[in-house]
Amino acid sequence: MSLADFMEQRVQVITNDGRVVLGSLKGFDHTTNLILSDSFERIISMDQDMETIPLGVYLLRGENVAMVGLVNEELDSEIEWTKIRGEAIPDVVH
């Protein structure tokens, strides 16, 4: 699969610094710069409820992208995100 297969679909992006950003993939280029719409960041921690930060239209630089995957929206909607706790994703080390 290529990013072209993900166009106009909800994706989850994990950045090199461990952030989790979700949104509808609107565009990309050969350096994996991504354009997302209706995007938001999920912040999960051990001691607080999951926080959602709306981002709207968002550009992610390819050098900061560690992973891009499709979101199973049915499964995602069944998860009680307010009850999820977890450690932060560590930075990517090259």
Swiss-Prot record:
It is found in: Nucleus; Cytoplasm. It holds the Pfam family LSM. PROSITE patterns: SM. GO terms for molecular function: mRNA binding; U2 snRNA binding. InterPro entries: Lsm8 (IPR034103), LSM_dom_sf (IPR010920), PTHR15588 (IPR044642), Sm (IPR047575), Sm_dom_euk/arc (IPR001163). Residues 1-74 form the Sm domain. One of its GO terms (cellular component) is Lsm2-8 complex. SUPFAM superfamilies: Sm-like ribonucleoproteins. Component of the heptameric LSM2-LSM8 complex that forms a seven-membered ring structure with a donut shape. The LSm subunits are arranged in the order lsm8, lsm2, lsm3, lsm6, lsm5, lsm7 and lsm4. Component of the nuclear LSM2-LSM8 complex, which is involved in spliceosome assembly. The LSM2-LSM8 complex plays a role in the biogenesis of the spliceosomal U4/U6-U5 tri-snRNP complex by accelerating prp24-mediated annealing of U4/U6 di-snRNA. The LSM2-LSM8 complex binds U6 snRNA terminating with a cyclic 2',3' phosphate group; RNA with an unmodified 3' hydroxyl or non-cyclic 3' phosphate is bound less tightly. This is LSM2-LSM8 complex subunit lsm8. It comes from Schizosaccharomyces pombe (strain 972 / ATCC 24843). The lineage of its organism: Eukaryota, Fungi, Dikarya, Ascomycota, Taphrinomycotina. The gene is lsm8.
